Amino acid sequence: MTSTVELTKENFDQTVTDNEFVLIDFWAEWCGPCKQFGPVYEKAAEANPDLVFGKVDTEAQPELAQAFGISSIPTLMIVREQVAVFAQPGALPEAALTDVIGQARKLDMDEVRKAVAEQQAQAGQNGQEGQEGQ
């Protein structure tokens, strides 16, 4: 039995809305590093039954991959209380994945929302200035 949930454009929003803590593995069948990360992700899902571990097949769900700007796979994203708090491409080793989950569990989401609001306010004030030099 798998401990992960296959996410599609049909169930993605509801899964993220209904669950406080969702990990998302963006992957594809042809991707070698994705196949290496798969068992690590499954093991983490079994070790953390209180969290939702979702998988997005970027070949079957290109709209979801595009919506999140996924350009490299595998990419791991963590969404807490509907806020993306972590996103990183690459197959994380088991110890690194465990560490990231632990750090995400410890986040003070009130502080995170405050920081996001401040960033959005700053971006609004700066307009396109932040685009220079890229």
UniProtKB/Swiss-Prot annotation:
Its main location: cytoplasm. Residues 115-134 are annotated as: Disordered. GO terms for molecular function: protein-disulfide reductase activity. Induction: Expressed from 2 promoters, 1 of which (trxCp1) is under control of SigR. Dramatically but transiently induced by the thiol-oxidizing agent diamide. In an rsrA mutant expression is constitutive and uninduced by diamide. GO terms for cellular component: cytoplasm; cytosol. It is found in: Cytoplasm. InterPro entries: Thioredoxin, Thioredoxin-like_sf, Thioredoxin_CS, Thioredoxin_domain. It comes from the Bacteria. The keyword Ligase does not apply. Residues 117-134 have a biased composition (Low complexity). The keyword Transport applies. It holds the Pfam family Thioredoxin. SUPFAM superfamilies: Thioredoxin-like. Residues 3-106 form the Thioredoxin domain. Disulfide bonds join C31-C34. Keywords: Cytoplasm, Disulfide bond, Electron transport, Redox-active center, Transport. Belongs to the thioredoxin family. Component of the thioredoxin-thioredoxin reductase system. Participates in various redox reactions through the reversible oxidation of its active center dithiol to a disulfide and catalyzes dithiol-disulfide exchange reactions. This is Putative thioredoxin 2. It comes from Streptomyces coelicolor (strain ATCC BAA-471 / A3(2) / M145). The lineage of its organism: Bacteria, Bacillati, Actinomycetota, Actinomycetes, Kitasatosporales.
